[in-house]
């Protein structure tokens, strides 16, 4: 009997040993943390080798005078490190690939002036809940609203990447800022349904419809809205500025020559015509940064065999600028002189089209800046770029918004 038990134990040890040996291991590294520290349970082994499925609990602890900006884990992405962030502590990280773990802290003075509301869900047309964050100056009442739309090739990032801009735009206490998220193109959200550019635009209009419905809860005026965004968000903010007249229930390309957008969120009791008319009146300024404006540079991302170049024009601000006699939508455009993705000529083409339509437009080139200088991430390089180029031109943008919403008498 004892011999039998010994054999059984030996077999189990062999099986267990084989199972352990076959486990997939990944490298987990801890980033240097400034102005605070992180506590991780269980501890990361000295060699950084961690089994797939391991769950870490990370607690971020700021130094005196600082607050948590974000805890995160980062992985390699198409354009460098991609950050998965948590604005609260503790947070959990489940290991499924090589990754870095860290935290970013900022001076408390950066957020003392505002109330921040995270992750307000406005719709869920696919697998991903669509949400926005609100940055409201303390004591805000009936302030104009700024809606920020993030970039990332319509295929990455969330509203979190624009939080630096949101904080800056609220420092003078003149605006309530909403930073929105949207679906990613094709099936990059992990769903079975293909997401087209028209769907993404419907998310933008849905977010704005939800914001208009709830703006007063945060001290905002739903009848006075500005839109801004960078890169892909530059395109989408230009769409929001120039094309709310295309909101409708006629479908996008289903009928030849008809390209309309049904917002992914519709307020109860309102018709699509009401939402369209209210949004056309409310959106009064646009500040797209280093965006794509022409249909020749856009993709409709549709798998419909009927999709052709007219579908690209249907999502192109350049092809849909209203004449100022119909609707005024002043623009403030920015681009870095060393931007290798967005060319000066492409922005100038949009500027010329706005001028031809009688619209007011200001185009500012930022000397020495490359792409995405309005973004905010936990890494030192992005923060330094934001400080060097972003902060100043955000306040120049705010001066433009002030000229619309706080005109000199």
Task: Outline where the language-model segments fall.
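Surface-exposed interfaces of beta-sheet-rich extracellular modules
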Residues: 54-87
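Short beta-strand element of the alpha/beta-hydrolase
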Residues: 142-151
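Short amphipathic alpha-helix adjacent to the substrate-entry channel of hydrolases
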Residues: 160-179
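Alpha/beta-hydrolase active-site loop
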Residues: 194-216, 393-395
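Short beta-strand/loop motif that positions the catalytic acidic residue
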Residues: 327, 332-335, 339
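C-terminal catalytic histidine-bearing segment of alpha/beta-hydrolase fold enzymes
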Residues: 332-334, 345-351, 355-409
């Amino acid at each position: 009997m004892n011999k039998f038990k010994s054999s059984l134990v030996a077999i189990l040890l062999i099986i267990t040993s084989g199972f352990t040996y076959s486990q997939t291991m990944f490298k987990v590294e801890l980033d240097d943390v400034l102005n605070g520290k992180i506590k991780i349970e269980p501890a990361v082994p000295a060699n950084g080798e961690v089994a797939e499925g391991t769950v870490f609990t990370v607690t971020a602890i700021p130094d005196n005078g600082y607050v948590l900006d974000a805890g995160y884990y980062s992985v390699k992405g198409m354009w460098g490190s991609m950050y998965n962030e948590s604005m609260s502590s503790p947070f959990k990280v489940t290991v499924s690939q090589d990754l870095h773990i860290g935290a970013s802290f900022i001076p408390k003075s950066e957020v003392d002036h505002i109330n921040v509301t995270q992750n307000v869900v406005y719709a869920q047309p696919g697998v991903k809940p669509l949400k926005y964050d609100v940055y409201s100056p303390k004591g805000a009442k009936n302030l104009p609203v700024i809606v920020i739309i993030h970039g990332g090739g319509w295929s990455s990032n969330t509203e979190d990447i624009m939080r630096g801009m949101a904080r800056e735009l609220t420092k003078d206490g003149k605006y309530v800022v909403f930073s929105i998220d949207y679906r990613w193109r094709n099936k990059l959200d992990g769903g079975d349904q293909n997401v087209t550019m028209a769907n993404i635009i419907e998310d933008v209009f849905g977010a704005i419809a939800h914001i208009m419905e709830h703006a007063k809860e945060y001290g905002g005026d739903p009848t006075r809205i500005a839109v801004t965004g960078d890169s892909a968000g530059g395109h989408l903010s230009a769409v929001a500025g120039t094309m709310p007249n295309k909101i409708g229930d006629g479908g996008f390309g289903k009928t030849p020559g008809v390209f309309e957008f049904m917002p992914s969120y519709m307020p109860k009791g309102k018709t699509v015509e009401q939402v369209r008319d209210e949004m056309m009146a409310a959106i009064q300024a646009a500040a797209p940064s280093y965006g794509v404006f022409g249909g020749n540079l856009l993709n409709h991302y549709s798998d419909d065999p009927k999709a052709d170049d007219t579908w690209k024009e249907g999502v192109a601000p350049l092809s849909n600028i209203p004449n100022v006699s119909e609707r005024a939508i002043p623009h403030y455009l920015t681009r870095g002189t060393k931007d290798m993705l967005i060319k000066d000529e492409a922005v100038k083409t949009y500027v010329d089209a706005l001028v031809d339509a009688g619209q007011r437009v200001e185009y500012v080139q930022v000397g020495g800046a490359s792409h995405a200088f309005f973004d905010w991430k936990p890494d030192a390089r992005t923060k330094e770029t934001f400080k060097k180029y972003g902060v100043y031109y955000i306040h120049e943008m705010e001066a433009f918004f002030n000229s619309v919403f706080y005109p000199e008498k």
